[in-house]
Amino acid sequence: MILFTTLILFLLTIPLSAQVNEDLFNAMDTSTEQISLLPSSMVFTQRLLWGEKGLMRKTNLMPLSVENREKEMKVRRKMLLAHQVIGYATLAGMVAQGVLGTQLYKGNYDLKDTHELIGNATTISYFTGAGLSLFAPPPLISRKKEGMSSIKAHKWLATIHFSAMIATNLLAEENKKYHRAASYTLFGSYAAAVLVFKF
């Protein structure tokens, strides 16, 4: 009787384990088919160039493939490194602008041309750095962390300093009081965005 019961239990478990193994293999097959080469979310500028229907894909310059995504990661790294270097140069330009602007407000108008020249160079470097960040290929995966992170703070501050940069340039000739307020907002938020990665 014990032998008969053991035999029946043994025979009943064989088909069950085979089904579990089949389900496991089926799950593995479907999971490999669903691997995406692009992250689930991208900035609209990245989607414009690097998305599945982006300009790089449609023009066939960088068709979506594993090999090309590896190349894109190298391009991304170089673009973000350049973004960082240009960011430091832009910050230095903003400091110089602060010194020159203060002298202008004190009545030293001999520095007006220098202030405008450095202002234009700083604006060009600012938007070049912003473009490198906004148009870099997207990361492999989207990392969404709960709570505050240095990258979230950097992006929030970028929204502030981007708006302040536009306001500073628009108000340069129109209204000195608001130009100064916009430039202080620009410098404060930009410096904080640079420093947020250091701490």
Give the ranges of each region predicted by the language model:
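Bacterial Sec-dependent N-terminal signal peptides
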Residues: 1-20
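N-terminal targeting leaders of membrane proteins
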Residues: 16-113, 129-145
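Intrinsically disordered/low-complexity terminal segments and short unstructured peptides
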Residues: 4-5, 12, 29-31, 44, ...
